[in-house]
Swiss-Prot record:
Component of the eIF4F complex, which composition varies with external and internal environmental conditions. It is composed of at least eIF4A, eIF4E and eIF4G. Its EC number is 3.6.4.13. It catalyses: ATP + H2O = ADP + phosphate + H(+). It comes from the Eukaryota. It comes from Neosartorya fischeri (strain ATCC 1020 / DSM 3700 / CBS 544.65 / FGSC A1164 / JCM 1740 / NRRL 181 / WB 181) (Aspergillus fischerianus). This is ATP-dependent RNA helicase eIF4A. It is an enzyme of class 3 (hydrolase). Belongs to the DEAD box helicase family. eIF4A subfamily. It is found in: Cytoplasm. Pfam families: DEAD, Helicase_C. Keywords: ATP-binding, Cytoplasm, Helicase, Hydrolase, Initiation factor, Nucleotide-binding, Protein biosynthesis, RNA-binding.
């Protein structure tokens, strides 16, 4: 960790310049602990994704690392594998601290760490708001080697001296742009002040606005910078279609017709507002479709139940807002429907990058009114992709 103020002006707005281009194209050649390697393969990974090929080794070597990459590229596994490689399972106490912007994402990261570290005898605790403080304190006192959490609760636990940082080796900020844009700047700066000077810092972010760059300049020492460009992100394997809908109010019938045509194993339907999510859920339920809904207004416990039902397959269709696009990671989703096109093009990949990550096939269907055509063209241009009119035989493709 470092404190300096130079170097900020060198970086073009919104994007970092890579200063590292070594690629390691297999997990076997990363010299990982055998029990970690076993966990990686057991989790279902075969070969590293673009970001994993570039970022895992410099992190393991102890460099501060800034990685710019979108969701759906394998970021979580990148820092999970790196942290697990550097941990000493025999030492109790937090050795890797991971911050995430939302509770969902923190819990998802915890699941990945636990799954990949399955053969390593390590503990990972999710330290998040909306849970019982006493239970949190009890879990932390047992000395889990990895703690993943949201900034407010983590800061609180460090200040109470329940989350000890004496053994801390690595501090990881995931989706840094999201954390700062949600107003966690002060907590994050406070956490930095409470950590040992020698802590290695790893920062991951989809975009690089000024406030993220300031964090990197203030708190990172000669960081390795890795940019995974858009074209390395995968819309590959995802068939993208649009259905032209003349009027907004006809979308509901269009969706019902689609339901009739297609056997949906699992689908996520995205709307742009919480109100629309509730409205659509009511309408579909009234038409005897079984759907669940999830948005930011809901209590945490309620969201957990919905997510659990969806992951286990007992609920087949989830209607959600963009807020949760980054926190939903359901491997078996075969279909994503954009009932509303996203309000900004960056969110398009967060939404549909779900359906076919890492070569899993998926289908995305966009409902497009006359007002949406321009946005759809922008999305096509931005991702150098084609969104074609939905064919009659769409059922065969899903």
């Amino acid at each position: 960790m470092a404190s300096n103020d130079k170097g900020l002006e060198e970086i073009p707005e919104g994007q970092i310049e890579s200063n590292y281009d070594e690629i390691t194209d297999s997990f076997d050649s990363m010299e990982l602990k055998p029990e970690l390697l076993r966990g990686i393969y057991a989790y279902g990974f075969e070969r590293p994704s673009a970001i994993q090929q570039r970022a895992i080794l410099p992190i393991i070597k102890g460099n501060d690392v800034i990685a710019q990459a979108q969701s759906g590229t394998g970021k979580t596994a990148t820092f999970s594998i790196s942290a697990l490689q550097k941990l000493d399972p025999n030492v109790k106490g937090c050795q890797a601290l991971i911050l995430a912007p939302t509770r969902e994402l923190a819990q998802q990261i915890q699941k990945v760490v636990v799954a990949i570290g399955d053969f390593m005898n390590i503990e990972c605790h999710a330290c998040i708001g909306g849970t019982n403080v006493r239970e949190d304190m009890k879990a932390l006192q047992e000395g889990p080697q990895v703690v993943v959490g949201t900034p407010g609760r983590v800061q609180d636990m460090i200040q109470r001296r329940v989350l000890r940082t004496d053994n801390l080796k690595m501090f990881i900020l995931d989706e840094a742009d999201e954390m700062l844009s949600r107003g966690f700047t002060e907590q994050i700066y406070d956490i930095f002040q409470l950590l040992p000077q020698s802590t290695q810092v790893v920062l991951l972010s989809a975009t690089m606005p000024q406030d993220v760059l300031e964090v990197t300049t203030k708190f990172m020492r000669d960081p390795v910078r890795i940019l995974v460009k858009k074209q390395e992100l995968t819309l590959e394997g995802i068939k993208q279609f649009y259905i032209a809908v003349e009027k907004e109010e006809w979308k509901l019938d269009t969706l019902s017709d689609l339901y009739e045509t297609v056997t949906i194993t699992q689908a996520v339907i995205f709307c742009n507002t919480r109100r629309k999510v509730d409205w659509l859920t009511d309408k579909l339920t009234a038409r005897d479709f079984t759907v669940s809904a999830m948005h930011g207004d809901m209590e945490q416990a309620q969201r957990d139940v919905i997510m659990k039902e969806f992951r286990s397959g007992s609920s087949r269709v989830l209607i959600a807002t963009d807020l949760l696009a980054r926190g939903i990671d359901v491997q078996q989703v075969s279909l994503v429907i954009n009932y509303d096109l996203p309000a900004n093009r960056e969110n398009y990949i967060h939404r549909i990058g779900r359906g076919g990550r890492f070569g899993r096939k998926g289908v995305a269907i966009n409902f497009v009114t006359a007002d949406d055509v321009r946005m759809m063209r922008e999305i096509e241009q931005f991702y150098s992709t084609q969104i074609e009119e939905m064919p009659m035989n769409v059922a065969d493709l899903i």
